[in-house]
Amino acid sequence: MKDWFAGEVAERYDESTADMPVEPVLDFLQPFAGGGALELAIGTGRIALPLAQRGVRVAGIDLSPDMVAQLRKKPGGDEIPVAIGDYATTRVDGSFSLAYILFNSINNQTTQDGQVATFENAARHLEPGGCFVVEVGVPARERLSVFDLSDTHVGVDEYDADTQRLVSHHFTLVDGRWERLSMPFRSVSPAELDLMARIAGLRLHERWNGWKREPFTSESTRHVSVWEKPA
């Protein structure tokens, strides 16, 4: 898996996600995290750091050394153990009552095998009765869709339903010039995720439209799903 978050992408990441909610995410995750939490694709610690500040033992895995370097610059960032590597295969010490992967990061695995391996790796780290939480979008209905539009950034998703290949095109204004970054993903349906979970020995516990437990419906564009490892 390629590191798409090196250099300036890592440096700008916190700014680009500054408007995303944090407290509702923490409120959702914390009740599952009594036995510690493992974040796959921990990145700059947007969620891991405030979760640790609530008293949760947190560890992480991330492919990008530059993203983790941003985490290390923050207060408390050097206290969270992070393994550098592919979150589908990299192991960390210990077991946890919660593993989680957020903000469409499961789609960074661009093959079905990679996504199944992600579930299997999460399950290996879970103690019996532990839960794996995934936040991800529902596959698009349109071939092209604009997901962000501002004076300095335009984001366009290009989706091929036949291959489930999604490419996010980011056009960013930098020093008066527009720069493009195109990142590949594999979009995956809730039903396919449920099957991946079964392969990994997990079972669906709950599914919601968002962090405040809004009902998931046929009109939902994303979901927060929880799978449980049998006790």
Language model: regions and residue ranges:
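Conserved class I S-adenosyl-L-methionine
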Residues: M1-G43
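Class I SAM-dependent methyltransferase SAM/SAH-binding core
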Residues: T44-T89
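A short acidic, Gly/Pro-enriched loop at the edge of an enzyme's catalytic core
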Residues: R91-L98
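A conserved beta-strand element that flanks and buttresses the S-adenosyl-L-methionine
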Residues: Y100-L102
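A short glycine-rich, Lys/Arg-flanked "PGG" loop and its adjoining helix->strand segment in the class I
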Residues: V116-P128
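SAM-dependent methyltransferase
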Residues: V133-R198
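C-terminal lobe and adjacent flexible extensions of AdoMet/dcAdoMet transferase-like proteins
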Residues: E192-A231
